[in-house]
């Protein structure tokens, strides 16, 4: 098939704030037979094109080797031993395991590979109870992030509880007690009920139909969080509105009477319970965050405790500052282990782990292997965490407090075939703001302006891009490619103020930062516009969409994954309404003006565009696949150049989680054969 399938342009549109929006592809928002047939034709066109590339099969052996490596997920320590998910080299999904000691053999508790013949069923998360005797886990199908929750007994491996069709839930809203657990349940995707939320309590051994409700009054923009602790008499309930603010409440265990802890502050509060003490990482009066604490036993339950002060001597201040804000680093997370407070900091987009005593005095800094990223840290006596960098695959590490170094518990057997160099480089954006990017390349690569390069970014929701090990980038880097990862405004790399500088009416700054990064790569001899591609997914897909519509001259190719693109209708389906705190609402006249200005779908015009590969998942329950469908159709009709506009919709996949390795390999072969062909790489 030499040209894309014809797409029916219908006489449809809608009125928004007295403006008529012509939308001939509005019908592609449906899920009927016409759309299914159109999607199948687009898949055939994309498959024909990608399948014709010789490079695709030449890359396959290396990609299979990279994918078929035993991988290790974080360790969760409990009183009776260690839980961990591990994926064997020949498996599609990781299995959930347990071992009493780190030197003992793992025993498989749950194997999702046996739950379906095609790898469509996955176990995406799990939470052991404090003594490790029980473990709850979430089971989803086709990557849709809609869960059944099952509970098994660790010793016997037997399932003792099963809650069906719980909805969009996870460990962030799950809390064990001695006799049961708090959990979030939502409506289903099919009936548009994902934004209908309820926090319930389930007592082990009882009928789930008898579960009682702790809270059910949540706005569409608000998501709850739950925090419990084995030594606490209380449960903490958080109401987080977008990425904007958090209200905190608490209740005695077993009671549905909630009391206000922090309500009405325009700041984020992330609580950790330690007995009846609450430690909170907060942005209130601290763009770089600080740690405060309070004893729930000392809080007057008849009043709303909204004063979060900075003085530990003020008797009228319920919260005391334990760890003050730093001006050179962002406090991102905390955990309490024994009498120590461990804080993960982000400084210049690289992580640090710092240990404080109970009074907030710094005891030590955990020695990390290099400039990289830390995730999933915690423990009972020792500290466990995951570490990775651009040149080191994720390893599970253990740190005994006071030691000189960390020890490796588990590490995959992946190594690069060449020496790589990583630099962090700064450049000026359109308004003069200095923005950094990591640049990864072969150490002996000549910067002669003629190397293929891929620029990756995100720039939103206070999400920070820190060093990561991308195994499928390795063949590209080894063959002389350049990878650049830009830390754009809208992210969290430099605190709440950096996030606010790139959201709502300031969203264009994110795109300008990305364009400046592209120009920096060209001006410094890393690449040329003829060999530069942009790459991003989800909110990063919006970034890619804005890049190819605003600056098609900068890029030769683009990969745009599970994207948001029709920004006048993003809020009408799935989780879109939740994101109005980040983008603004098109229903608001003021927000409508600046959103329409950059909305990629509404900025497509007849001209020559770079080659684009759009990808989406048919079971995506976050970003509606209609964004990719409508954008691909409009760009195919508008393309006056010779480069292809492709759309690949993947079956039995969602936004990204729960994807079997076999599908990951095919997806990566599509992306990198496309990029390799367009950039003359490999």
Regions inferred by a protein language model and the residue ranges of each:
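Beta-propeller blade signature
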Residues: 98-99, 150-153, 197-206, 249-253, ...
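Polar, glycine-rich mid-to-C-terminal structural blocks
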Residues: 197-240
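Active-site-proximal cap/loop segments of hydrolase catalytic domains
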Residues: 488-682
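Short coil/turn segments that connect the beta-strands within blades of beta-propeller domains
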Residues: 80, 131-133, 178-179, 231-233, ...
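Cap/lid segment of the alpha/beta-hydrolase catalytic domain
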Residues: 113-126, 143, 401-404, 409-533, ...
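Non-catalytic accessory segments flanking enzyme active sites
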Residues: 34-127, 138, 222-240, 244-252, ...
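Blade-edge beta-strand/turn elements of extracellular beta-propeller
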Residues: 112, 155-166, 206-218, 254-261, ...
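Asp-box/WD-like beta-propeller blade repeats and closely related beta-sheet repeat scaffolds
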Residues: 106-125, 136-139, 143-190, 197-200, ...
């Amino acid at each position: 098939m030499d040209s894309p399938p014809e797409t029916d342009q219908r006489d449809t549109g809608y009125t928004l704030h007295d403006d008529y929006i012509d939308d001939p592809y509005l019908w592609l928002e449906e899920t009927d037979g016409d759309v299914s047939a159109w999607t199948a034709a687009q898949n055939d066109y994309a498959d024909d094109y990608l399948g014709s590339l010789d490079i695709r099969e030449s890359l396959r052996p290396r990609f299979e080797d990279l994918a078929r490596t035993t991988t290790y997920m974080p360790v969760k320590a409990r009183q009776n031993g260690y839980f961990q998910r591990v994926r064997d080299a020949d498996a599609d999904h990781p299995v959930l395991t347990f071992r009493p000691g780190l030197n003992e053999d793992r025993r498989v508790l749950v194997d999702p590979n046996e739950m379906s013949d095609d790898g469509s069923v996955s176990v995406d998360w799990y939470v052991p109870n404090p003594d490790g005797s029980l473990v709850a886990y979430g089971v989803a199908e086709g990557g849709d992030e809609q869960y059944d929750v099952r509970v098994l007994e660790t010793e016997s491996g037997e399932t003792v509880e099963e809650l069906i069709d719980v909805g969009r839930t996870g460990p962030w809203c799950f809390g064990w007690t001695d006799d049961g657990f708090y959990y979030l349940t939502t409506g289903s995707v099919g009936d548009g009920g994902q934004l209908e939320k309820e926090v319930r309590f389930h007592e082990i051994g009882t009928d789930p139909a008898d579960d009682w409700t702790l809270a059910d009054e949540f706005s569409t923009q608000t998501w709850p969080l739950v925090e419990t602790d084995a030594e606490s008499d209380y449960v903490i309930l958080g109401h987080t509105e977008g990425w904007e603010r958090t209200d905190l409440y608490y209740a005695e265990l077993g009671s549905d009477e909630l009391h206000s802890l922090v309500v009405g502050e325009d700041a984020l509060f992330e609580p950790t319970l330690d007995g009846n003490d609450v430690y909170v990482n907060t942005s209130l009066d601290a763009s770089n965050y600080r740690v405060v604490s309070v004893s729930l036993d000392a809080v007057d339950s008849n009043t709303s405790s909204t004063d979060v002060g900075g003085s530990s001597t003020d008797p009228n201040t319920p919260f005391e500052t334990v760890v003050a804000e730093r001006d050179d680093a962002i406090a991102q997370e905390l955990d309490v282990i024994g009498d120590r407070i461990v804080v993960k900091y982000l400084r210049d987009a690289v992580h640090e782990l710092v240990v404080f005593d109970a009074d907030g005095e710094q005891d030590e800094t955990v020695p990390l292997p290099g400039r990289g990223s830390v995730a999933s840290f915690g423990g009972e006596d020792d500290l466990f965490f995951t570490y990775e960098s651009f040149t080191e695959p994720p390893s599970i590490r253990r740190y005994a407090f006071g030691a000189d170094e960390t020890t490796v518990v588990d590490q995959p057997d992946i190594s690069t075939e060449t020496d790589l160099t990583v630099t962090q480089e700064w450049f000026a954006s359109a308004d003069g703001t200095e923005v950094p990017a990591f640049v990864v390349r072969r150490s002996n690569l000549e910067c002669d302006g003629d190397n293929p390069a891929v620029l990756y970014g995100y720039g939103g929701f206070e999400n920070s891009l820190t060093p990561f090990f991308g195994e499928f980038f390795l063949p590209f880097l080894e063959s002389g490619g350049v990878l650049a990862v830009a830390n754009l405004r809208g992210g969290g790399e430099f605190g709440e103020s950096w996030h606010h500088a790139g959201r709502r009416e300031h969203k264009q700054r994110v795109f300008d930062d990305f364009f400046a990064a592209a120009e920096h790569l060209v001006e410094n001899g890393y690449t040329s516009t003829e060999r530069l591609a942009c790459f991003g997914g989800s909110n990063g897909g919006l970034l890619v969409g804005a890049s190819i519509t605003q600056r098609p001259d900068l890029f030769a190719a683009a990969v745009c994954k599970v994207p948001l693109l029709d920004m006048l209708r993003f809020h009408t389906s799935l989780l879109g309404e939740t994101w109005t705190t980040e983008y603004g609402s098109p229903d608001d006249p003021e927000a409508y003006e600046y959103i329409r200005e950059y909305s990629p779908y509404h900025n497509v015009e007849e001209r020559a565009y770079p080659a684009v590969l759009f990808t989406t998942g048919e079971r995506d329950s976050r970003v509606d696949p209609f964004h990719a469908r409508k954008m691909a159709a409009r760009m195919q009709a508008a393309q006056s150049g010779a480069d292809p506009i492709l759309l690949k919709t993947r079956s039995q996949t969602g936004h990204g989680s729960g994807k079997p390795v076999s599908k990951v390999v095919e997806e990566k072969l599509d992306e990198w054969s496309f990029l390799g062909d367009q950039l003359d790489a490999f």
